[in-house]
Amino acid sequence: MLTWLELSVNYEVIIMAITQAMCTSFKVELLNGVHAFGTTVARGSTTADTMKIALFTSSATLDATTTAYSTSNETSGTGYSAGGNTLTTVAPTSSGTTAFTDFADTTWSTSTITARGALIYNSTQSDKSVAVLDFGSDKSSSAGDFTIVFPTADASNAIIRIA
């Protein structure tokens, strides 16, 4: 007599994900006047806040609910420092009914790093999050340049658009 043995195994799968989004907390903070991308008087200051971009591995969980920069699952490697690069902001402007701002491209020169996504955050305002970038897959550099090319700064393409 032939008997089949059924084996039941339970697996707990933890899936990390990076989902591109403008952070919800950032939207509320905009309405509260927390972030200053330009040099117009804000909070009694005429200097723009410092925006930074940090790279993260595929183990990171970043999405619209991300409220602040954290070193958890941040990329590491030659040519990369924790906290990432300081961004150069393109002056906020508008076209039609859409306000927008963007950033100049940024490069980690002669670097050896792998990243799945990035977080743009405001280091002037307690590292509050602005936006999450999802690269779609791991991107790497090996003793070369790792460059993030931002889209055209216009009402249809800028990385931060409010319509």
Report each predicted region and the residues it spans.
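Small cysteine-rich, disulfide-bonded extracellular modules of the LU/uPAR three-finger superfamily
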Residues: Y11-R116, S123-A163
